[in-house]
Amino acid sequence: MSVRSLAGTNVAWDFVELPSQIMENWCWERSGLDLFAAHYETNERIPDELYEKMARARTYRAANAQMRQLGFAAADLALHQDYDSARDGDVMAYGREILQRHSSTKLPDDYAMLAGFGHLFAHPVGYAAGYYSYKWAEVLDADAFTRFKKEGITNPEV
């Protein structure tokens, strides 16, 4: 089997982020984490109490992260479909106004995140709409990981 043909952006855009997204699941399973997470000198595993705290904090601020992604999508769509410099003025102010609607805190007046959002505007491999494959990969990985959970996350048959 040619692994190179399945690497990086050599796959369909709606699949491109699945490998990285699904791998994160093993880090949240104790048996998966214990395969590699150990103190560099003593080889001691992460204490149960710390692991339990980590697991409880896993979704901390998840709503903020989701709203941030929705803001990126809304700004992307607005800039590519609706923005007119003669009508809407400064592009950074326009984008900031859209992003503000998706933020739980006030953005600074000089907030210029869009200027550095290379995924959409200046990515060397033409990522553009492929950026949103992260959200789709979260759906795919949640579905795919159920099989590993059911049959064992280290089961070589899966």
Residue ranges and their predicted role:
Residues 1-158:
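Cation-handling catalytic/transport regions enriched in His/Asp/Glu
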